[in-house]
Amino acid sequence: MARPSPLCLLLLLTLLPPIVPSNSLLTEPPFRWRFYLHETWTQGNRLSTVTLATVDCQPHGCQAQVTFNFTSFKSVLRGWSNPTIGFVYDQTHSNCRDYWVDTNGGCPYAYCRMHVTQLDTAKKVQHTYRLTSDGRTTYFLTIPDPWDSRWVSGVTGRLYRWPTDSYPVGKLRIFLTYIRVIPQVLSNLQDQADNIKHQEEVINTLVQSHPKADMVTYDDKAEAGLFSWITLVRHGARLVNMAGLVNLSHCFLCTALSQPPLVAVPLPQAFNTSGNHTAHPSGVFSEQVPLFRDPLQPQFPFCYTTPNSSWCNQTYSGSLSNLSAPAGGYFWCNFTLTKHLNISSNNTLSRNLCLPISLVPRLTLYSEAELSSLVNPPMRQKRAVFPPLVIGVSLTSSLVASGLGTGAIVHFISSSQDLSIKLQMAIEASAESLASLQRQITSVAKVAMQNRRALDLLTADKGGTCMFLGEECCYYINESGLVETSLLTLDKIRDGLHRPSSTPNYGGGWWQSPLTTWIIPFISPILIICLLLLIAPCVLKFIKNRISEVSRVTVNQMLLHPYSRLPTSEDHYDVALTQQEAAR
């Protein structure tokens, strides 16, 4: 069984009669009020913003409290912390409302009102606490008054790691919007339709079936003869209806995008060539078209020519000159389709296999269980790849550390060449990435402008989109010129890196010659040796003096140890005088 791609075409709607929606779908309003919780924090030198959670009000309005459920804050790590939120709108002290708002969120003092995370292991939202946690995986942030108009314009708060911290680590923004509720099935179908359109555009660039294919819009593809997955599946749906299949309410028609879209099905008898058929251009119509083989019938029902008579139940016995296939039929000869067959008896083509066939879309009918098992395969564990080149670099570094001159030179040259190649690849990848991002931003800007114009038309009686939402109007500032300038700079750098390797120029001086590459690795060892030779005499002289001094002291101690110094008369007189002074 062929494995379908994830872009399975859920087009059984063309097979089934219109489904009458239930009362719940009819009574449910298509629009709803939705709260958004955004967190903004600084990571290094980059400012990041992420949507932590969303929650919808009741279908008939925001008349009761709502609660956000989310796993964690991005700027506060779970564990050694107690997240605390401070809002400006609910402060009671003037210092908290009027000062330190930009840096501290209105809370540099202990008397400001803070919403500290409270432990709630029962996971029951309490009215008395704004921020709670189950202590393990989930935080609960409650909005007690969702009907207040402040949420429409947006409320900003500061996030602290601890209640005693002086400065916040992130910023929270809560706002309320009126959105259109799209069922999940329709949302999935919209995503699949976008993917199908993208696949059709890729295929149309490869299939040159129209001289002006780039100028044909998506709606005119069927008339222009371009390939379309939608048209293909519609033909398959018609065949299913003609076959009389019933009870297909939970089945899916799928096609594999990696396989040919059409398959040739052998017909049980020859074409009727007596009638007048529409003239078709001569020559090969298509190549490499697979042939369907019925596993229950080992032989083909009918063949015009065959290399082996056992392959076919019946073989054509008439003349094979100037045969034309009617509308919807083709001659299949060795994976090639043609509308005309002209084979003589002595022609080598008479020994090939030629069949009357009809083209059928290559679709597969899956049940819901089969599709779930095919679209969601089991996860595979990733295996680590052993990188031997890393070991080679480590060995080379070891040789350099050991002082092997040849190894050091080879490592230096190979590392320089590898660094140059990687730098060129990085610049080329950066240029391509910037160009791709610029194209995406320009496309998004065009789509946003079209949506803005459509919204202004729909809300013209209410003063436009901005007046209807009560917000300031935002406009897109096109700064694509900066990106284009950066791309030109990267291109110049890339050309400069390529130029020395293709057209070397050694006229700049002796330091730019190839000999410099061989001399540089020897400079450091030579300098170290010269330094050692300069200080070696001083070191040797110092060591010699110290050895002599130690030897002299040792000899004196050994020779004069049995002797002691005798007292003299002067010494005796000095002792007597000292005793007299002490007696006084």
UniProtKB/Swiss-Prot annotation:
Motif (CXXC): 251-254
Chief localization: virion
Compartment annotation: Virion
Cytoplasmic compartment segments: 541-584
Extracellular side: 23-514
Motif (CX6CC): 466-474
UniProt superkingdom: Eukaryota
Entry-listed glycosylation sites: N69, N247, N272, N276, N308, N313, N322, N334, N342, N346, N478
Record's comment describing the protein's domains: The CKS-17 immunosuppressive domain is present in many retroviral envelope proteins. As a synthetic peptide, it inhibits immune function in vitro and in vivo.
Protein name: Endogenous retrovirus group FC1 Env polyprotein
Natural source organism: Pan troglodytes (Chimpanzee)
Gene name, Swiss-Prot/TrEMBL: ERVFC1
